[in-house]
Amino acid sequence: MSDPAPEVASAVPVASPAKAKKEKKPKTDKPKKAKAPRTHPPVSEMVVNAIKTLKERGGSSLQAIKKFLAAQYKVDVDKLAPFIKKYLRGAVTKGELLQTKGKGASGSFKLPAAAKKEKVAKTPKKAAGEKKPQAAAKPKKALEKKKSIAKKPKAATATKVKKPVAKSTKKPAAVKPAAKKAAPKPKAAPKPKAATKPKKEVKPKKVAAKKPAEKKPEAAKKPAAKKA
């Protein structure tokens, strides 16, 4: 008889305790590196300051801006180059900068009429100061309008008063005949005065005395004819 084959024990991998410990270690246990404080202002501020100080008519190029940043802020321009280009593109699209030459981040850049912005900032103050007198002037105009409105009714009343005056002038013209009718009454009153005047005049009496004197001699002549 053949001997039975020996049983082979199956090898089962068992995790070592050392590996388990490594996996359980939290990552937060590592100390974080403290961020170094910035020794320069933001890229946008530096670029705007560079363009302002350079004051180039045709605009400042990217190379000129980099040179200014390296000299003024002592910054590693090669590391900041992508940030500078990104800001230039965004500023052009937003209208914060004008690109006089080139396309994208290459070319020359200029501020959009900084002097005009200052003037515009000053003019709103003046406008605000001017609006106050205008607001004060509006009530004056309103008062003038009210006065004119008040004057118009006065003129209307004056015209209304004038019309009745014209009518009253016409009425006296119609009353004149009534005055003429009343005139004969005073004429009748002076008649007694005229009667007194003939009493004072002696002339009519003298004429009456002469006529009978002439008749008397005629009567004397007639009896003389009878005697013959």
From Swiss-Prot:
- Basic and acidic residues bias located where? 115-133, 211-221
Bias (Low complexity) ranges = 1-18
SMART domains, per the entry: H15
Instruction: Look up the domain of life of the source.
Output: Eukaryota
Q: Looking at the record, which segments are called Disordered?
A: 1-44, 98-228
Domain H15, which positions? 39-113
**Which keywords annotate this record?**
Chromosome, DNA-binding, Nucleus
Q: Where is the composition biased (Basic residues)?
A: 148-170, 178-209
List the cysteine pairs that form cystine.
none
Q: Which biological processes are named by the entry's GO terms?
A: chromosome condensation; negative regulation of DNA recombination; nucleosome assembly
According to the UniProt entry, its GO molecular function terms are: double-stranded DNA binding; nucleosomal DNA binding; structural constituent of chromatin
Q: Where in the cell is it found?
A: Nucleus; Chromosome
Q: What is its main location?
A: nucleus
What is the name of the protein in this document?
Answer: Histone H1-III
Look up and give the organism this protein is from. Glyptotendipes barbipes
Q: What taxonomic ancestry is recorded?
A: Eukaryota, Metazoa, Ecdysozoa, Arthropoda, Hexapoda
